[in-house]
Amino acid sequence: MTTTELVALLHLASPALPIGAYSYSQGLEAALDANLIRDADSARDWIASGLTDVLAHGELPFLAHQLARWQTDDTHALAAENAWFVASRESAELRRETEQMGWSLAQLCASLEWGDAARRATLASLSPIALPTAFAYAAAAHDASADATLAAYAFGWVENQTSAALKAVPLGQLAGQRIIVALRGAIDAAVRRALATPPDAVNTFAPQLGILSARHETQYSRLFRS
C-alpha cells in the first residue's frame, strides 16, 4: 500500500467525513431499548455480531464487487447492483440511511473532482445511490486496493457503532477503545470472508436487525436516526 492510498482511505474512514454517519446507530439504539445491550460486554458482542454475521456476508462483499465494477467501468452492473442493494434494506430507516450517506459522499466526490469526468457522470446518474457504491467510487478514484478499501470501511463502521454505544448505553471512552481493540481481528476475518464471496452469494438477510430497525421508527425516545 502506498502512502497516498493509506491517507485517502484514512480520510474516507474518518468520522470527520461530512456524510452524517454520527447520526445513525443501525439498530443499536433499538437493541438497547430491547435490553439486548446493557453494558460494555453486551455492546461489544452486538457490534461483533453485526460485523461477522451481517457486514461480512452482505455490505462488505457488495462493496468489493462495486469497487471492481468502477475499476472496469461496468456501468450496467453498477446501476443494477446499486438498485438491488437499496431495495435490500430491511426498513425505511435503513434505506434512508444508505441513500442519505451515499448521496452526501457522492456530492463530496463530485465537489472535490475525484475520478475522471466520465466516471463522475456515471456517479451522478445513480439516484438513489447506496453508501457502499459511493464509497467504492471514492476508493477507485484513489486507486485503492480491495482489501484495504474493505478494511477501511469495516473499521469506520465499527468505530461509528462504538461511538453510538458510548452515547446510548452510555459507556466511557476507555470502554469504547477496548471494544475497538477487541474487534481488530474480527475486521481482518470479515474482510477475508468478503473478498472470497462471489457476486451471487452476497447475502443481506438480517431479520433481527430489520425488526429492531422497524421498531426504532416508533421508539418513544431516540438519539439516532436509525
Curated annotation (Swiss-Prot):
InterPro entries: UreF (IPR002639), UreF_sf (IPR038277). GO terms for cellular component: cytoplasm. Transmembrane segments: none annotated. It comes from the Bacteria. It is found in: Cytoplasm. Belongs to the UreF family. This is Urease accessory protein UreF. It comes from Burkholderia cenocepacia (strain ATCC BAA-245 / DSM 16553 / LMG 16656 / NCTC 13227 / J2315 / CF5610) (Burkholderia cepacia (strain J2315)). The gene is ureF.
